[in-house]
Amino acid sequence: MEDLIFVTAQPDVPYFHWQVRIYVHNFIQKGINPNNIHVISGMVNGNKEPTLESLELKKLGINIHHYLDNRHKKYYIPNIKPFLVYKWLEQYPQFGKLFFLHDADIIFRELPDFNSLIKDKTIYVSDTIGYIGYNYIMDCCNRYEKQYPNSPKQQLITDMSDVVGVSINKIKENQNNSGGGQYLIKNSDYHIWQKIYMDCVPLYDTMMNYHKKYPIGAPIQFWTAEMWSLLWNLWYFNFDVKVSEKLSFSWATDNNFIYEKHTILHMAGVTEDLKHSKFYKGEYINVNPLEKLKENPNQFDYVDKNSSTINYINIMKDLIEKEV
């Protein structure tokens, strides 16, 4: 595992600066060498230089990489991730051999058994089958077609698969390996990530245009276009991809009983109506929760002790204690 590097890619904005600090603290706690942590930041909103806050993260002993956000189309925000990975591997091709690509809003309850996952050429991913698998897409197709019985059958999945260049059969056969979120990537290069990036917006546009033509109340999740582009392009380039239980994650909406069953906590899912008993990161887009906690040690006392998010709060508290 000493060769494994840990990578996130996101805009250089305050919302991600504090998230990086928290997961880096957690990773180091779990024994990960800070030199194996790489943060790829996109200089956005017309900025031509890295922010001071982003440069400050170097003091954690981690690797920070900055690239100008010169994506062709920026209205689909998630495509910045594959864009930045593409730019990073273009500059540092040696890192394409093996890396764990993860979201910035995760922590490890315990380290996954990476040693058992890095021995072969298979790319291992977390289980997101429920919202990007073949069955999910077909459920969406059926909802659209039920409301519009004269519409072409399976048009949505056909148009989506045509964007990337994979067959519907390929997607169907890999229903049980339709994962994402966190990826143990092996033997990739910048050409692959360039295509992943380039296919994101066409996928997003394809879904949006279909929905505009056939609007329904419960549409397909447009925001996961980047996840489909990443997964399907791995198949396009003939990678073996498998969902691994060792990379399973709990959500921020879960309780501690569920949290204890997974190696990873993904701090997503909490909405504004749940913020009175769980940590809601949407309130901290422009505010640093670490600073709030420094000012008031009781800042997050409202968080339910049985909420998985209490574990995130505890890491924040530990980080602040270590800094003092």
Regions found by a protein language model. Give the residues of each.
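Substrate-binding rim/cap in mid-to-C-terminal beta-strand-loop elements of soluble/periplasmic
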Residues: Y136-Y148, P152, G179-S188
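Short catalytic/ligand-binding loop motif for oxyanion handling, primarily in non-cytosolic enzymes
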Residues: Y15-F16, N47-E49, I107-L111, I132-N135, ...
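Catalytic core and acceptor-binding pocket of nucleotide-sugar-dependent glycosyltransferases
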Residues: Q155-A268
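C-terminal catalytic/acceptor-binding lobe
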Residues: G217, Q221, V241-V324
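GT-A fold catalytic core of metal-dependent nucleotide-sugar glycosyltransferases
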Residues: N79-C140
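A structural signal for well-ordered alpha-helical segments within the folded catalytic domains
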Residues: W18-R21, N79-Y86, T224-W232
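A structural signal for short, well-ordered beta-strand segments and their strand-loop junctions
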Residues: V39, F99-D103, V125, L184, ...
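N-terminal anchoring/stem segment of glycosyltransferases
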Residues: M1-I77, W88-G96
